[in-house]
């Protein structure tokens, strides 16, 4: 996979990163509202 890292379009990386960040934030807030986020 080291050969394909330089060939991946930046917009794909940005989109995937954005979705992961939004997903993590969503899970964090959902967990905190459910009472599970207090352990974090």
From Swiss-Prot:
Keyword check for 4Fe-4S, yes or no.
Answer: no
Main localization category: plastid
What cellular-component terms does GO give this entry? chloroplast thylakoid membrane; photosystem II reaction center
Kinase listed as a keyword: no
> What stretches pass through the bilayer?
8-28
Location(s), subcellular: Plastid, Chloroplast thylakoid membrane
Describe its function: One of the components of the core complex of photosystem II (PSII). PSII is a light-driven water:plastoquinone oxidoreductase that uses light energy to abstract electrons from H(2)O, generating O(2) and a proton gradient subsequently used for ATP formation. It consists of a core antenna complex that captures photons, and an electron transfer chain that converts photonic excitation into a charge separation.
Quaternary organization: PSII is composed of 1 copy each of membrane proteins PsbA, PsbB, PsbC, PsbD, PsbE, PsbF, PsbH, PsbI, PsbJ, PsbK, PsbL, PsbM, PsbT, PsbX, PsbY, PsbZ, Psb30/Ycf12, at least 3 peripheral proteins of the oxygen-evolving complex and a large number of cofactors. It forms dimeric complexes.
Record's family? Belongs to the PsbJ family.
Q: Which Pfam families match?
A: PsbJ
Q: Which organism is it from?
A: Ipomoea purpurea (Common morning glory)
Topology relative to the membrane: Single-pass membrane protein
GO BP annotations, alphabetical order: photosynthesis
Q: What UniProt keywords apply to this chain's record, in alphabetical order?
A: Chloroplast, Membrane, Photosynthesis, Photosystem II, Plastid, Reaction center, Thylakoid, Transmembrane, Transmembrane helix
InterPro entries hit by this protein = PSII_PsbJ, PSII_PsbJ_sf
What is this protein's name?
Photosystem II reaction center protein J
Q: Which Gene3D superfamilies match?
A: 6.10.250.2070
